[in-house]
From Swiss-Prot:
Its cofactor is Mg(2+); Zn(2+). Binds 1 Mg(2+) ion per subunit. Binds 2 Zn(2+) ions per subunit. It comes from the Bacteria. The lineage of its organism: Bacteria, Pseudomonadati, Pseudomonadota, Gammaproteobacteria, Candidatus Pseudothioglobaceae. It comes from Ruthia magnifica subsp. Calyptogena magnifica. This is DNA-directed RNA polymerase subunit beta'. The keyword DNA-binding does not apply. GO terms for molecular function: DNA binding; DNA-directed RNA polymerase activity; magnesium ion binding; zinc ion binding. Zn(2+) 1 binds at C70, C72, C85, C88. PANTHER family: DNA-DIRECTED RNA POLYMERASE (PTHR19376), DNA-DIRECTED RNA POLYMERASE SUBUNIT BETA (PTHR19376:SF54).
Length: 1395
């Protein structure tokens, strides 16, 4: 009975666990795993195919080859289970134990484990405080290590060469000291190590040392020693005495035809180890000469090294086909390794794949499934149903019936498939909408039919795409597929909350065509009582589709949640719109569709419908729209021919004008008036403008036609040109493509992004000549190459994002924090990109929002901003709102739903258990792939925007400046001398409506608070050069200006003015060595007082003379700008990657470390010394390279975090000096800029979620009374929790600073070592985890997938919560039950003994 209980307990124990710990295995542990020692290198007998005894496949050690049969076949079948055959020694059991049972090899000499030796930082090196080189010399028998110096003058752990060793022997004798070679020496040192003493010494040393390098080293060692003490790992276990042998079925040996064998590389590597080990054992028995034994030990060490990690040290061991053998490390790492190939990616049963075709008659939740496929996929259900209905007596009969395809099978199939959802998946699955559930309709043929409206979500088209079908088997799986994954339940895009079920292409074309209006049509002016009457009239041929008519319509109002008809009115409309109104759901205003319906209108319609109606109505409406769109696009017969591409008459004239302008500039260049760079920029500018003009002329010509109305007058109306209608409706093509068809192709880009200055003046209708065709090939080729290369990049970015966000799940409803981020409207130049209402929609307020200019509360703290609130916010003109954010959430594991806000894909507050980290990663990664493929479609036509050289405002209002430093020049205009200035325009409500950046050197024509009118020019600048402005009046002195050596003096042929040009450093002669040309500004009266110095780059032009007196605001020098490059996402995707990897840009901006007054100290040879004196009088010094332009002057007061020297921002500095909120705003803004450029809409919250994960770690500056070490990097939440405990105990708190980690680094630094190991650098992660005895509590999604459990998200989240609760309850119950049972058993035993 007790044994039974024991077995029962063991079985339970195996099933349920909450964490996985990894550590170093002791020799005893390895022996305890083992079922026997492998002593021979033989594998199997090549004649009998039986395993050799005590060999690598021995059945006695690893278990039987066949189920329940010993090797000699004495015992067969189940009745002898667990019997050990006395003849061959094999246990009779399942043959699958050959996948589980391990063996071992007793090593004749200890061997160091290569992971702990070579995986950086070397654990052995750290622990023994020796360099890796020294340890290797000992290990590979090149030097002796003193393990016990005795009373000699030798030092512990001293290295001795052979010569030194023998000298020491002669001097001291061999009893006085001990020195050894090989792993044995290392093992001795490690086993003698007393970790507690070592830790105490290290603590003392770190307190006493002044050297930063030593402190770092001590802290590193202390961390390792502490973790060894805490984990119970012994250091000497890093040296192996016993080597475990992998179960044979994990390193199989398969006989091929012709007497050959296919074998796993591991068998070869094990054979080498066993051979060398046996040879060494024999040599030791024979007492062979030391040198031979040493050599054999070294070879054994190398053999074990290559078994564990081949190629890590020295040359790889090659197989017979000249490729390196795959070692144990190779088996687990990389894409083909155990983690990514078998644990995270598994093949799926009950699946099929086929080509997809369009199913225009399907409902949104349906797909067409070929009968042949369904028959195969639903086999088990069919067998069951055939048996239940009594059509087949056994499974065998059912199987025959299905194979012969008898008629009743098809009836059963219909019944089985009815309302049984299947999953459709299209690779690449970039976001969760790449797998959706549909109800199958059985169809003839072999292609899967897909509903056209879900193509957007799958990114599918019908040009040969394939899709896979999966069948959910269990009831629960079917239920989840139906409720969560059915296509009709996934109407919104999870990245932006916009509808994704939007009709496109032909459907849009049909709707657009039917809702266009035309004058002088049959039936014009008729009045219809309702839409059905209009439809009847149209179908009977009494009116045409585009005729202008009057229609009586009904308006609806919402009463008690239902739409009731309220008023009737007559509207002017067309027959087509009247027909379309028949499918409009009650409650949607007719005014929404009383226009030509383009793609945008349709998208808005679905959005409004989803927000005001129920989900079902929206889905039905989308379907109805699709059917109608297809019907009328077929009826319209829209197609196009070459005559539809109208070439504007004015084109030739425009091109001639442009050529003349280019010729003028060319002449100016040949006279030397302009530099080559300026000429190039101007030429590009002319052609860009001309291209735009031609395009505009073409659109005007193609977009309008003359029609004769009923009175015989001519009217210019929107054209019915096919090409125009396709582009205007948004069905096919764009104005950019039309421009190339019938305008001019314009400028082309070279593969490096620079623009070729000869444009293609022809279009595709005229045809290209040889030269133009050749220029075109550049862009076309770049498009294809880009697509191939960038898809991989984008996929890798998504993988890193998923990895960093995978363990972030909504775990509670509200964390109760008051923190949040301040949101403002997004304004770019003269247009509002996103209003404040849109930005805050679906977010929870972090504080009370007041009405403008009053104390009345408009939205209370903790309110979820709804659609109505969002509109109200815009109306009221509120400036900014503080909302809760994932970044500032206080939940321990995960995020609370209040900090996250709305679920983008559902439109209501997010539920507990949603995997927001993965959703965020998919939302950011999915468009990445699309963006990378963007270049390809426009065929490389250059998209250089015409150069902007001024700010012209669009609205009347008041101008305000931000961060503006300026000086007044002699014309009384302001000259800007700050680099991050902006001008904003506010309307009469005080709302900011426009915002522009102002470059350094710009001239401002309006004062702060000055009124401006629309179209006023308020700022202008030279777009082709960067000026250097004099900030004070004074005298100019040239330093190191030597004509012909450092500068050239040239004369402008037009103006006759002379100017200096720098000679590029690379081209200067030796005479220029040590000369650094610069301009000094000194006081006019006293040349000793230096006002400022300006270092000059090599491309500069100077229009001044030496000793010239100038006023403030004058231009000292001009630096020509870089040549125009096209803006393309190629720059965008790496930009996003750089932001998420938190990379420091080269020459990044320098920020002020503290608030205070600036002064300049004595400078060194290459650096300037900047001194900031704060209010307490403390001075902080900063050293800045001399070639950096410094934007501050002596005596200026500046704020912490201000920019001293311009450049790309460094996110680490922003976090350190300006805080988490500033960093969050910076990353969100920069990432959004890249995506917005491509017209992709992503919600800010997804980017915030990733930033939260990047901010997981902190650096401990002062450990206070905690157990942390100064300088240690640890989890933010752990520090917060420890601080709470310390505060309660009244102890000193930890002082820390937040760290920003790139997504790769953050993924590797996650608390879960399983997740990190499956991501990258597997061996390094596992080495670190095992030495520190890491415990993985299986919090994230990845770890749970790997150990084969439900993920703790969605329905799995509840499952794990329930499981934990049950576990706690069962422990208390089990203890009681066990106690009672034990009492009863004791009683029974006592009674039996008495009896």
């Amino acid at each position: 009975m007790r044994d039974l209980l024991k077995i029962h307990k063991l079985e339970q124990k195996e099933q349920d666990f909450d964490a996985i710990r990894v550590g170093l295995a002791s020799p005893e542990k390895i022996r305890s795993w083992s079922y026997g020692e492998v002593k021979k290198p033989e594998t199997i007998n090549y004649r009998t195919f039986r395993p050799e005894r005590e060999g690598l496949f021995c059945a006695k050690i690893f278990g039987p080859m066949k189920d329940f049969e010993c090797l000699c076949s004495k015992y067969k079948r189940m009745k002898f289970r667990n019997v050990v055959c006395e003849k061959c020694g094999v246990e009779v059991t399942h043959s699958k134990v050959r996948r589980e049972r391990m063996g071992h090899i007793e090593l004749a000499a200890p061997v160091a484990h290569i992971w702990y030796l070579k995986s950086l930082p070397s654990r052995l090196g750290l622990l023994m405080d020796m360099t890796l080189k020294d340890i290797e010399r000992v290990l590979y028998f090149e030097a002796f290590l003193v393990t016990d110096p005795g009373s000699t003058s030798l030092v512990h752990k001293q290295l001795l060469t052979e010569e030194m060793y023998f000298d020491a022997l002669d001097e001291y004798g061999d009893d006085e000291f001990e020195a050894k070679m090989g792993a044995e020496a290392i093992q001795d040192v490690l086993s003698d190590m007393k970790l507690e003493v070592e830790a105490a010494n290290l603590r003392e040393n770190s307190l006493n040392t002044k050297s930063q390098t030593k402190l770092k080293k001590y802290n590193k060692r202390l961390k390792l020693v502490n973790s060894l003490i805490q984990s119970g790992n012994k250091p000497e276990w890093m040296v192996l005495k016993v080597l475990p042998v992998l179960p044979p079925d994990l390193r199989p040996l398969v006989p091929l035809d012709g007497g050959r064998f296919a074998t796993s590389d591991l068998n070869d590597l094990y054979r080498r180890v066993i051979n060398r080990n046996n040879r060494l054992a024999r040599l030791l028995e024979l007492d062979a000469p030391e040198i031979i034994v040493r050599n054999e030990k070294r070879m054994l060490q190398e053999a074990v090294d290559s078994l564990i990690d081949n190629g890590r040290r020295g040359r790889s061991v090659m197989g017979n086909n000249r490729r390196p053998l795959k070692s144990i490390s190779d088996m687990i790492k990389g894409k083909q390794g155990r983690f990514r190939q078998n644990l995270l990616g598994k093949r799926v049963d009950y699946s099929g794949r086929s080509v997809i075709v369009c199913g225009p008659y399907l409902k949104l939740h349906q797909c067409g499934l070929p009968k042949k496929m369904a028959l195969e996929l639903f086999k088990p259900f069919i067998y069951n149903r055939l048996q239940v209905k009594g059509l087949a007596s056994t499974i065998k009969v059912a199987k025959k019936m299905v194979e012969s395809e008898s008629p009743e099978v098809w009836d059963v199939l219909e019944r089985v498939v009815h309302q049984h959802p299947v999953l459709l998946n299209r690779a690449p699955t970039l976001h969760r909408l790449g797998i959706q559930a549909f109800e199958p309709l059985l169809i003839e043929g072999k292609a899967i039919q897909l509903h056209p409206l879900v193509c957007g979500a799958f990114n599918a088209d019908f040009d040969g795409d394939q899709m896979a079908v999966h069948v959910p088997l269990s009831e629960e799986a079917q239920l989840e597929a139906r409720t969560l994954m059915l296509a009709s339940n996934n109407v919104l895009h999870l990245a932006s909350g916009e509808p994704i079920i939007v009709p496109s292409q032909d459907v849009i074309l049909g709707l657009y065509y039917m809702t266009r209006e035309m004058i002088n049509q049959k039936g014009e002016g008729l009045i219809f009582a309702n839409a059905t009457e209009a439809l009847n009239a149209y179908e009977s041929g009494n009116v045409t589709l585009h005729a202008k008519v009057k229609l009586r319509i009904q308006d609806y109002q919402k009463i008690d949640g239902k739409f009731e008809s309220s008023t009737k009115r007559i509207v002017d409309t067309t027959v087509g719109r009247a027909i379309f109104s028949r499918i409009l759901p009650n409650g949607l205003s007719f005014d929404l569709i009383n226009e030509a319906i383009s793609k945008k209108v349709v998208s808005d319609l679905i959005h409004v419908c989803y927000r005001t109606q129920e989900l079902k109505q929206t889905v039905v409406f989308a379907d109805q729209m699709m059917y109608m769109g297809f019907q009328y696009s077929t009826k319209s017969g829209i197609s196009f021919c070459s005559n539809d591409m109208i070439i504007p008459d004015s084109k030739a004239k425009m091109i001639e004008q442009a050529k003349t302008q280019v010729k003028d500039i060319q002449e100016q260049f040949s006279k030397g008036v302009v530099t080559d760079g300026e000429r190039y920029n101007k030429v590009i500018d002319i052609w860009s403008r001309t291209s735009e003009k031609v395009a505009k002329a073409m659109m005007d010509e193609i977009g309008f036609e003359d029609f004769i109305d009923a009175d015989g007058k001519t009217q210019k109306l929107a054209s019915f040109n096919s090409v125009y209608m396709m582009a205007d409706s948004g069905a096919r093509g764009s104005s950019a493509q039309m421009r190339q068809l019938s305008g001019m192709r314009g400028l082309m880009a070279k593969p490096d992004g620079s623009i070729i200055e000869t444009p293609i003046t022809s279009n595709f209708r005229e045809g290209l000549n040889n030269m133009q065709y050749f220029i075109s090939t550049h862009g076309a080729r770049k498009g294809l190459a880009d697509t191939a290369l960038k898809t991989a990049n984008s996929g890798y970015l998504t993988r890193r994002l998923v990895d960093v966000g995978q363990d972030l799940v909504i775990t509670e409803d509200d964390c109760g924090t008051d923190n949040g981020l301040i949101m403002k409207a997004v304004i770019d130049g003269g247009n509002i990109v996103q209003t404040l209402g849109v930005v805050t929609l679906g977010r929870v307020t972090a504080e009370d929002i007041l009405m403008p200019d009053s104390t009345e509360v408009f939205l209370e703290k903790g309110h979820l901003v709804s659609l109505d609130d969002s509109d109200k916010i815009n109306e009221l003109g509120i400036e900014s709102i503080k909302v809760r954010s994932a970044i500032t959430c206080d939940t321990r594991y995960g995020v609370c739903s209040s900090c996250y806000g709305n679920d983008m894909a559902r439109g209501h507050k997010i539920g507990v258990g949603e995997a927001i980290g993965v959703i965020a990663a998919q939302s950011i990664g999915e468009p990445g792939t699309q963006l990378t493929m963007r270049t390809f479609h426009i065929g490389g036509a250059a998209s250089a925007s015409t150069t902007i050289s001024s700010v012209n405002v669009n609205t009347d209002g008041v101008a305000h400046f931000e961060n503006l430093k300026s000086i007044t020049n002699e014309n009384n205009n302001l000259v800007v001398i700050s680099r991050s200035s902006e001008v904003t325009i506010r309307n009469n409500k005080g709302q900011e409506v426009e915002r522009y950046k102002i470059p350094y050197g710009a001239i401002v024509h309006v004062q702060e608070g000055g009124k401006v009118k629309a179209k006023d020019k308020i700022v202008d600048w030279d777009p082709h050069t960067h000026p250097i402005i004099s900030e004070q009046a004074g005298r100019v002195i040239f330093v190191d200006f030597v004509e012909g050596v450092t500068v050239n003096k040239n004369t402008d042929p037009l103006t006759g003015l002379t100017f200096f040009e720098m000679i590029d450093e690379a081209e200067r002669s030796t005479a220029a060595k040590g000369l650094k040309p610069l301009i000094k500004m000194v006081e006019e009266s006293d040349s000793e007082v230096v006002l400022s110095t300006h270092y000059l780059p090599s491309t500069v032009k100077i229009n001044l003379d030496d000793n010239q007196v100038i006023v403030a605001g004058e231009v000292l020098a001009k630096i020509p700008k870089d040549l125009s490059k096209t803006s393309d996402i190629t720059g965008g995707l790496p930009r996003v990657a750089d932001l998420f990897e938190a990379r420091k840009a080269k020459d990044h901006s320098i920020l002020v470390e503290a608030t205070g007054v600036i002064s300049f100290g004595s400078s060194t040879k290459s650096k300037d010394r900047l001194i900031i004196t704060n209010s307490e009088g403390e001075a902080i010094e900063m050293m800045i390279h001399k070639w950096r332009q410094i934007n501050v002057f002596d005596g200026e007061t500046i704020e912490k975090g201000d920019v001293i020297s311009d450049g790309p921002s460094n996110p680490h500095d922003i976090l350190r000096l300006l805080g988490v909120e500033a960093l969050a705003n910076y990353v969100v803004r920069e990432v959004q800029n890249v995506y917005r450029l491509q017209g992709v809409n992503i919600s800010d919250k997804h980017i915030e979620v990733i930033v939260k994960q990047m901010l997981r770690k902190v650096e401990v500056l002062d450990a206070g009374d905690s157990s942390f070490v100064n300088g240690e990097t640890t989890e933010y939440v752990r520090v917060i929790e420890t601080n709470k405990q310390l505060e309660v105990q009244g102890k000193e708190l930890i002082i820390y600073q937040r760290l920003l980690m790139g997504i790769t680094k953050a993924s590797l630094a996650t608390e879960s070592f399983i997740s990190a190991a499956s991501f990258q650098e597997t061996t390094r992660v596992l080495t670190e985890a095992s030495t520190t005895g890491r415990v993985d509590t299986l919090q994230g999604l990845k770890e749970n997938v790997i150990v084969g459990r439900l993920i703790p998200a969605g329905t799995g989240f509840k499952h794990h919560q329930k499981r934990r609760a049950q576990y706690v309850a069962s422990i208390t119950q089990t203890i009681d039950a066990q106690q009672a049972l034990a009492d009863q058993l004791n009683e029974a035993e006592e009674q039996a003994q008495e009896g």
